[in-house]
Amino acid sequence: MLKDSGDIMWTEGTNAIIVHSYVHQPLVNVRPGLALGPHGSHINVNTTWWKDGKAWVDYLNRAQTLLQRGRVPSDVLILAGESLPNRRTRVTSYDWPVVHAGYYFDFCSPKDLLDSIKISDGKIVAPSGVKYSVFSLAEEIRPTLNTLKAVKKMLDAGIAVCGMRPIGSPSLSDDDAEYAKLVNEIWGADNSKNPRKVGKGTLYPEVSALRALTDLKIEPVISAAKNFKCIARVCDEASIYFIVNTNMSNANGEFSIRANGDKTPEIWNPETGEIKPLPQWKRDGQTIKFSLEFDPKESEFIVLRDGAEQKHFEKFSAQKAEGYVKPENIDIIEAKYRLRGTKEGGKDVKEILEKVYPDGFSVSNRLFGDPYPNKFKELYIKYKVGKRETEKIVYESENHFWKGLEWMPPQSIYPTVLDGAPAMVFEINGSAEGELSDGAKFSTKVENLPRPIKLSSDWSVEFAKDLGAPEGEIAFDKLVSWTERPEFGIKYFSGTAKYSKSFDIPEDFISKNRKVLLSLGEVRETARVKVNGKDAGILWKIPYEVDITNLVKPGKNTVEVEVTNLWYNRLVGDEIKSPLKAGETPKWVLEGKSRADDNSRYTFTLSKGWTAESKPMPSGLIGPVEIRAAEVVKAD
């Protein structure tokens, strides 16, 4: 959820995320300690996933380094308004069509308009050197006389101006006759709704700048497929485009970006730091058009910079082989949005869920409404997959990736780059064809990918000590949420547990130009992976999948997965065994101890959003876990 929220904020202009209450933790002997309750995210050294959070922080650092470069390439300058205090505090409904069409804008004050900006070669020029093609009064209908004079000056110089006909000046010192005359000169006496020439420029008697941008034939900075959000930055050496897949499932997006000059596109991955050429794209005048495959909620940077253009795909299409198994259809029997931890009442949301579940969804008031304001809620689902009937609970503010209500790894065929040359990744048997940038056509088929190696049974699990779980190794015959185990100390465990297992890889599973992928399926919440004793990385978001090609060998192998969940379950378990009154601080906390003397309580915090009746959250390595092969084939 932190990544999802941060990504969206970045696309709306934020470029520095600060952990603002990291230092506000006076309780060093107890966990989780003081919390922000419903007012923010609890992130400090007492957080269960603090060490694994490095992967998320690295992601923030890489992304914000790029997002802080240069400036947003705005084409429109908008007057922020004449009111005092200023009513123009945020982007309005009039602005969003411009943003959604792929353009950007900046605001200016009336003082900026009069004292700072200049007109040169049909452009508005800011002191910073930024040039704008369109000026907008937005919804301001009471500009001052001086503002109108500045607007007339821009029109005479050839600027396109957008704005509704003023109804009068807000200033008693303005001359009414001069004001009315200037309004008629700009908007005309007939009050027409059509654009009109004024001087060398054009007046658009409307709030939105979209028609003016279109008439001026200004290409969008970036045009994106549905359910993708974007923002762009430009600096002297590069153009930077940040793209977010807001879908809860894999998505292949079609994009068009403004590309002045002959710079070539690259993919910069903020999760890994990897930089590679964009595999599929085509230059079309002053734009570059491309397709790109995204994982659920994945974000990527496309960076245009100087460099020799390499051979790449211009056209690419793929067909999965016959026999590709799709997830079974889901029959939703019952769906209630209800108070967390209760079984009665709730809002019936079955019809809403049936419309959104195939692509995944976020459990929120935005989707379901708010039947219980200021209360913690949950979504209860009763459903059928085939003949199997199942129940599931998803908590408010959780994102849910729904493929048969079990996470299934993507099975795609997509373009990539191998050793600097165009290639294709086959995660499933099938065929691909298309055309390269040198005009060569290609057609490729893969038919003999080995079946995945299933690893969802017979794991050894060891829970962290002194947090209430049984000590020593515990056999998990099958992977389940900790909340489904009979042991109280596991059902209500919070912290880290290490899963261990050995497995065999057949000789023919590994070959040249074949990737070996470890897919963990559903994980709550983070996973630190080792294969054959070597670090494979930290997995902290869907899909919980990692490339282990260089870590495995034919024959016997081992895998270790350290999974960390949230504090919620242990807090509920402690409330069952040793309930506290609101505001009560136990003696052992005041004495500086880390837990109750009788081990009846392992946690303490002053914020409380649960009771002894609350249900614990799904936790641990839930799976299904499997090792898959993917063939990488060059487009020769």
Where are these regions (language model features)?
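Carbohydrate-binding surfaces of carbohydrate-active enzymes
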Residues: M1-N329, G404-T496, D504-S511, E626-A635
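Short, flexible loop/turn segments at beta-strand junctions in immunoglobulin-like
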Residues: S291-F294, Y372, V425, I548-V552
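Glycine/proline-rich low-complexity spacer/linker segments in large multi-domain proteins
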Residues: Q310-V325, A440-S457, N565-G623
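Extracellular, modular beta-sheet/disulfide-rich ectodomains of secreted and cell-surface proteins
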Residues: Y324-M408
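Short, surface-exposed tryptophan/glycine-enriched loops
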Residues: E344-Y357, D504, V546-K556, W567, ...
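Extracellular Ig-like/FN3 beta-sandwich strand-entry sites
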Residues: F376, E427-S431, P554-K556
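Short strand-turn-strand beta-turns centered on an Asx-Gly dipeptide
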Residues: G386, S437-D438, K530-G537
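Aromatic-lined ligand-binding clefts that engage carbohydrates, nucleic acids, or primary amines
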Residues: F503-I505, F509-N532, W540, V552, ...
